[in-house]
Amino acid sequence: MRLIALPAFDDNYIWALVAADGRAIIVDPGQAAPVIATAEREGLVPSAILLTHHHGDHIDGVAELQQRWPGLELFSPADERIPTTAHHVSHGERLSLLAVDFQVIEVPGHTRTHIAFVTDRHLFSGDTLFSLGCGRMFEGTAPQMFDSLQRLACLPGETLVCCGHEYTLANAAFALHVDSTNAALQRRQQEAQAMRHAARPTLPISLKSELATNPFLRTNRPEIRAVVAARAAGALSSEVDVFAELRRWKDEFCL
């Protein structure tokens, strides 16, 4: 299977997994136009859509795509804010699409019904795990988001993270503010700057790299805990407390 990142809006990515015969699985199509343009240019035929959550920048292209390809199947979490034509999937379920096996993982936090789709090579994490960051908690709690990230962190290190937005450079600035002596993080920032200068996506990225550089996956590290505790002006009794304070810090952070 070939993986294609389709830019949408200002910083979204729609993902396409493409079989040798041109049939494709589309993940989080917030816009129809990038999918249609790619299909026309490369001879793709979308056969299924996977949705991680209900936000418009991830689902608003669905109706137009289903009109263009009437047989298109749709899989999503059970959420009244998602088109009713979807097949609802939940934690632990497995799908076999175009000879690819997908596992569904529940990852609430960004939204209350957010899910991720995992294959033997790829993690489609939506707005839960980002390159060098994580999503804002619009509907969930810090313990929920922390648990969701820990669930994803247990996947094999070679898994490629395919998230919903190109946030790497902005996230790198915050990550280095927190973890300034991390040499791997410094290298990632330099690599990402070169990629973006060349108009290339910084994604996908290996989970192994995220575990070494993403502060939201490193809340057990003494250097992270110390910096976050200093900002909080007091002891933080658990990793969840560290995560919650780190997420608050990121929400307020500006260069």
Curated annotation (Swiss-Prot):
GO molecular function terms noted in the UniProt entry: hydroxyacylglutathione hydrolase activity; metal ion binding
EC number: 3.1.2.6
GO biological process: methylglyoxal catabolic process to D-lactate via S-lactoyl-glutathione
Any Pfam family hit: HAGH_C
Reactions catalysed: an S-(2-hydroxyacyl)glutathione + H2O = a 2-hydroxy carboxylate + glutathione + H(+)
Keyword rRNA-binding part of the UniProt annotation: no
Listed pathway(s): Secondary metabolite metabolism; methylglyoxal degradation; (R)-lactate from methylglyoxal: step 2/2
Claim: NAD is one of the keywords in the record: no
Cofactor binding note from Swiss-Prot or TrEMBL: Binds 2 Zn(2+) ions per subunit.
Residues holding Zn(2+) 2: D57, H58, D127, H165
Required cofactor(s): Zn(2+)
Binding site for Zn(2+) 1: H53, H55, H110, D127
Domain of life, per lineage: Bacteria
SUPFAM superfamilies reported in the protein's UniProt record: Metallo-hydrolase/oxidoreductase
Gene3D superfamilies: Ribonuclease Z/Hydroxyacylglutathione hydrolase-like (3.60.15.10)
This protein's UniProt keywords: Hydrolase, Metal-binding, Zinc
Family according to the record: Belongs to the metallo-beta-lactamase superfamily. Glyoxalase II family.
Role description: Thiolesterase that catalyzes the hydrolysis of S-D-lactoyl-glutathione to form glutathione and D-lactic acid.
Oligomer and partners: Monomer.
Protein name, entry field: Hydroxyacylglutathione hydrolase
